[in-house]
Swiss-Prot record:
Molecular function per GO: catalytic activity; glycerone-phosphate O-acyltransferase activity
Coiled coil stretches, renumbered: none
Modified residues (N6-acetyllysine): 641
Ranges spanned by the short sequence motif HXXXXD motif, renumbered to the chain: 161-166
Family of this protein: Belongs to the GPAT/DAPAT family.
Organism of origin: Rattus norvegicus
Protein name, entry field: Dihydroxyacetone phosphate acyltransferase
Pathways involved: Membrane lipid metabolism; glycerophospholipid metabolism
Modified residues (Phosphoserine): 12, 17
Amino acid sequence: MDVPSSSSSRFSVGSASPSSVLLYAKDLKKWDEFEDLLEERRQVSDFKFAMKCYTPPLYRGITPCKPSDIKSIVLNSEEINYVIKQLSRESLTGVDVLREEANEILEEMSHKLRIGAIRFFAFVLSKVFKQIFSKVCVNEEGIQKLQRAIQEHPVILLPSHRSYIDFLMLSFVLYNYDLPVPVIAAGMDFLGMRVVSELLRMSGAFFMRRTFGGNKLYWAVFSEYVKTMLRSGYAPVEFFLEGTRSRAAKTLTPKFGLLNIVMEPFFKREVFDTYFVPISISYDKILEESLYAYELLGIPKPKESTTGLLKARRILSENFGSIHVYFGDPVSLRSLAAGRLSRNTYNLVPRCIPQKQPEDVQAFVTEVAYKMQLLQIENLALSPWLLVVAILLQNQLCMDFDALVEKTLWLKGLTQVFGGFLLWPDNKLPEEVVQSSILLHSNLATLVKDQVVLKVDSESSQMVNGLVPQHIAFLMCSAYRNQLLNVFARPSLVAVALHMTPGLRKEDVFSCFSFLRNVFSDEFIFLPGNTLRDFEEGCYLLCKTEVMQMTGKDIILTDKGNAVLQFLTGLFKPFVESYQILSKCLLHEEDYFSEKEYLVTARKFTRQLLDQDASQCYDALSSELQKNALAAFVRLGVVEKNKVDSKYVYYVNGPATSKLEEMLGCKKPIGKPATAKL
């Protein structure tokens, strides 16, 4: 595996005078080595593995208790008693009735962690994973750091979320290394799987509703349940910052509800510190790749059921390559808050009284969420297939094999220079690496007479569940390409800004970059308030690859950098063009519309353009992108969002919409950052 060596480079953006401020410095990271834990599993009996002596290290301040004890502690807590009395006065409902309701909520959500269920899953998952994965690779150094952290302070596990099996995989890995299996926040969807949901409960899952609908009692019970487990050190708490799986393989913007809950004991000085552990789970081939494409094209996801699980047994005959699980360094909440946040406001009222979060605390929670996601992204392992599919999507979907290998090697070097965690087998020839990648994804690409062809140019007019096969294949390919964008987002945005800015004055390029970053801030993870630093990072990487040079007030492009610029703008072209298409689509909307109506119209409008060969932008069909675009349109003032009869409706600002479409199409100058909003 090639891993960039540590180095440090610096450059300044701005005046070239001696007094100019050094604005950016970037260190290339060196990652831990991986160990394949399936190697040992293939040598030892699965039953012996499941029944091994399991003595995980415990938090030094642990309060020993059973799952039933946790429920009792929650029901008798000052917080729940206070909320019940408040609600009783407000709703004129008896305290006993509300207490019974709280008990029912707890029965619905709580876990029943038992060692027997953990051993059962260890046995089953060992067999399944050996069948469908070549390797399950884990960085042992990260495991060792986690082992120490678990004994010192309460631990929050924050994995990336790409597949249903993420949480199962994580529990399997922790059991393998004799670490405590976490309690896991799971969606209520799983309750439809009767036997499975009970097994999940007994392996540590606790269930939460997608929305609480203003139910104060539910929120109080749920938050107190999570905080009780955290304060007692019962087990590491695991949840997904994204809230749901990313269907398009890009990290979704974070949800803050659970993060607020687990940070509160620290804010109220109920715990000395809390460790956050970002975990990056990378798949060579995503199990749900076709299911995701269907969902993005408007087909609702199948309801979770035991029958559906049994039907999914067909995946046992497929090869999904390898999984890489990277445990990041534990991050101390106390260290993050030092000099950044005052907890004094929490001393002014009793702990049991719910209080509105101060603005500085809200900003801090938001910042922590984005920082954790950026750490997840930094440690996501990239497979060679991502390079191959990104190149093919920019080369008319077909390419000579030798030319593809040459271009893939070129992109390999660029990815590593940009700081990407690329997994490239050093013991294989480049031709073998590319060929094995194509073979693993033979449902999407094939090698015919020295030509590599993406299987997206189907002549078949036969519909699949009302969908065009070509659209399904394109979105599956796009999902793999999207994984590269985590590494290339900032230099790509600078490249697009350079393309859209006449004259190449640094100030104008920065204005355009700021505008684009704002437009696409729901598509990619950018730390709020970090625009200048993101611009500097993008410029630094383009200077490092000799794409451009910085002078006092201007940017000079080099002939040597044409290939890099062309590739980077090509990576972002689908997003710019998709937002243009959706801007035009808005002008065809009625006076007001719901999100559901917008998605139907957007899909229909885009399909018409594709059918008429007026566009080749298949990414605009993605419902995930369409929702992100709508959020951006609201933020930019292109669309107004109002609540009417408990439902949200949207109104189009016609002139602002036309202006946005013109700006994205380079027909109108962007303007200065202060006036970049529409």
